[in-house]
């Protein structure tokens, strides 16, 4: 337990004794008053040490460049919970001259070391990647959902598990799953079409307004269920089914109270609060347990099917299912419990990120009709029409502009625009000694828009053309492996990158091929007011109030 944690325990005990004496004995011993005064003075001294003395004189990083001014309460932020962490990091990186490392402070003068160049990034993400991990609070919070999924394994265990899971995520294997992605994307389109027909939008005949993110999350959840686990969750057809409702319980929006806990968690261990029997904890546990039971059931079924196939027809594996679970089971390297943890990790990380990218794609295309027409012509020429049926293969090489749009969305709108890691042992970053416990930060929001890492103008603008130039189709003009950190980099990079890069074009292509899309913001003709699109405060790059679009169904495809 930390020093301030012990202080909190002693203060609680003293105050409890104070109240007991006051209520039952109607007197307050001087010893209790002395204790309270001493504890108050200790807190003042502790606070002064960490907010003034340590940052100025004692931090081992005092020689690193840092912003010229700092608030004791808010650090280098413009306020408490009023500015997203990635905006703070980018502002600091742009205003403080540096050689790859910057010392800056968040609320309560909590120190961060911001990594800004490729040399330092390579140390954190590749060369010494296993020296860094998530904070204790983040580990505890996420492990309630995923258990010991791939993101929490370290060292050789991580290498072994990743190596044996990788066959399910190779580009070749994911390509075999794209017909499932396409079928589900078309299922989403049909659902939207039905909503448009039943909608209340009367501004233009044959149109309707839909909110993108709800449809996107249901589509990507069903995709990962069907293609990933061989189990259709059915939320596109029935968003109110038990699976959909239980799954939602796992993703409660962080409250202001949680933000405070995370902030103070740098000094006090609040993990016990996540075990209290309050409604949020009960709902999260219930949702997680429900999904884990489904995962166990599917794993048992896939294991039985695999055994039957291996013991029949002389072990002929032709026509074996291609979902993630079956592929992982075929390696014979995982226990059922380990595989359940990995399934939960894929569920948590594997659908929301693509759904959010799709939402931003609809936002960008929704006010760019010229881009829509260009990609629609391409999609309708080379991708299967809704009436094709029984699609066996989807080839994206023939739709370069669709790929360019998806690549640009992933560059400009990384799902995790900012990340922190904690040094789990003494290590080095760019020749700088980094003691155990140091919090190191890096930001895709910085690297993905860094003019030193990318060629071409207007890196803050949405410009798919950067991916259309000869020789830049796969790089967009980036000159480093650390230029685009949407999927991170190194041995701990996102294992599902190929999945997202195949799934997103299916969703965007099906949507643009089927509808004319118009972004809807502000007051409409019928008096309805729709929100202006903006970023939500939080850890991920999501829209604050959703993205609403007016859809007009297009025929003759």
UniProtKB/Swiss-Prot annotation:
It comes from Gibberella zeae (strain ATCC MYA-4620 / CBS 123657 / FGSC 9075 / NRRL 31084 / PH-1). It is a multi-pass membrane protein. Glycans are attached at residues 127, 393. Keywords: Glycoprotein, Heme, Iron, Membrane, Metal-binding, Monooxygenase, Oxidoreductase, Transmembrane, Transmembrane helix. Heme binds at residue 494. Disruption phenotype: Abolishes the production of fusarielins F, G and H, but accumulates the intermediate prefusarielin. The chain crosses the membrane at residues 6-26, 32-52. Its cofactor is heme. GO terms for molecular function: heme binding; iron ion binding; monooxygenase activity; oxidoreductase activity, acting on paired donors, with incorporation or reduction of molecular oxygen. CDD domains: CYP_FUM15-like. The gene is FSL4. Cytochrome P450 monooxygenase; part of the gene cluster that mediates the biosynthesis of fusarielins F, G and H, decaketide compounds with 5 methylations and a decaline core that act as mycoestrogens as they stimulate growth of MCF-7 breast cancer cells. The initial compound in the pathway is produced by the reducing polyketide synthase FSL1. FSL1 lacks an active enoyl reductase (ER) domain and biosynthesis of fusarielins relies on the trans-acting enoyl reductase FSL5, before it is released through hydrolysis catalyzed by the thioesterase FSL2. The lineage of its organism: Eukaryota, Fungi, Dikarya, Ascomycota, Pezizomycotina. Belongs to the cytochrome P450 family. Pathway: Secondary metabolite biosynthesis. This is Cytochrome P450 monooxygenase FSL4. Induction: Expression is positively regulated by the fusarielin biosynthesis cluster-specific transcription factor FSL7, probably via its binding at the 5'-CGGNNNCCG-3' motif present in the promoter of all the cluster genes.
């Amino acid at each position: 337990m930390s020093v301030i944690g012990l202080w909190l325990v002693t203060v609680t005990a003293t105050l409890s004794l104070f109240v007991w004496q006051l209520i039952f004995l109607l007197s307050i011993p001087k010893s209790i008053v002395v204790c309270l005064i001493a504890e108050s003075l200790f807190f003042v001294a502790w606070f002064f040490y960490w907010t003034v003395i340590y940052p100025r004189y004692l931090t081992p990083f005092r020689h690193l460049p840092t912003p010229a001014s700092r608030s004791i309460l808010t650090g280098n932020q413009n306020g408490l919970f009023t500015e997203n962490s990635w905006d703070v990091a980018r502002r600091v990186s742009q205003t403080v001259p540096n050689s790859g490392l910057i010392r800056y402070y968040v609320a309560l003068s909590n120190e961060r070391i911001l990594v800004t160049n490729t040399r330092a990034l390579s140390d954190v993400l590749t060369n010494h990647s296993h020296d860094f991990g998530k904070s204790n609070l983040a580990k505890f919070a996420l492990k309630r959902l995923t258990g010991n999924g791939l993101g929490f394994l370290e060292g050789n265990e991580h290498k072994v598990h990743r190596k044996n899971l990788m066959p399910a995520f190779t580009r070749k294997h994911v390509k075999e799953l794209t017909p499932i992605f396409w079928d589900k994307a078309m299922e989403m389109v049909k659902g939207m079409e039905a909503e448009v027909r039943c909608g209340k939008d009367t501004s233009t005949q044959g149109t309707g307004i839909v909110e993108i993110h709800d449809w996107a999350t249901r589509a990507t959840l069903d995709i990962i269920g069907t293609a990933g686990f061989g189990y259709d969750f059915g939320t596109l057809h029935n968003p109110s089914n038990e699976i959909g409702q239980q799954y939602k319980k796992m993703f409660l929006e962080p409250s202001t109270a949680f933000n405070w806990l995370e902030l103070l968690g740098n000094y006090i261990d609040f993990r016990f609060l996540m075990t209290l029997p309050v409604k949020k904890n009960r709902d999260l546990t219930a949702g997680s347990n429900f999904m884990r039971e489904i995962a166990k059931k599917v794993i048992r079924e896939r294991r039985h099917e695999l055994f039957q196939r291996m013991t029949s027809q002389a072990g002929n594996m032709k026509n074996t299912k291609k979902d993630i679970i079956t592929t992982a089971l075929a390696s014979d390297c995982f226990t059922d419990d380990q595989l359940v943890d990995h399934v939960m990790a894929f569920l948590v990380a594997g659908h929301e990120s693509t759904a959010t990218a799709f939402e931003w794609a609809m936002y960008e295309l929704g006010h760019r009709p010229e881009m829509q027409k260009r990609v629609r012509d391409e999609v309708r020429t080379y991708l299967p029409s809704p009436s094709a049926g029984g699609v066996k293969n989807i080839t994206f090489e023939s739709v370069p502009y669709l790929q360019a749009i998806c690549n640009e969305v992933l560059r400009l709108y990384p799902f995790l625009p900012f990340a922190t890691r904690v040094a789990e042992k003494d290590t080095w970053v760019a020749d700088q000694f980094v003691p155990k416990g140091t919090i190191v930060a890096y930001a895709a929001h910085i690297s993905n828009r860094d003019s030193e890492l990318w060629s071409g103008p207007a890196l803050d603008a949405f410009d798919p053309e950067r991916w259309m130039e000869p020789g830049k189709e796969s790089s967009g003009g980036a000159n480093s492996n650390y230029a685009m950190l949407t999927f991170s980099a190194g041995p701990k990079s996102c294992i599902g990158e190929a999945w997202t890069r195949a799934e997103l074009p299916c969703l965007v292509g099906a949507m643009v091929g089927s509808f004319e899309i118009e972004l809807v913001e502000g007051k409409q003709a019928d008096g309805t007011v729709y929100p202006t699109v903006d970023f939500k405060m939080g850890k991920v790059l999501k829209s604050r109030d959703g993205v609403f679009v007016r859809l007009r169904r297009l025929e003759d495809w």
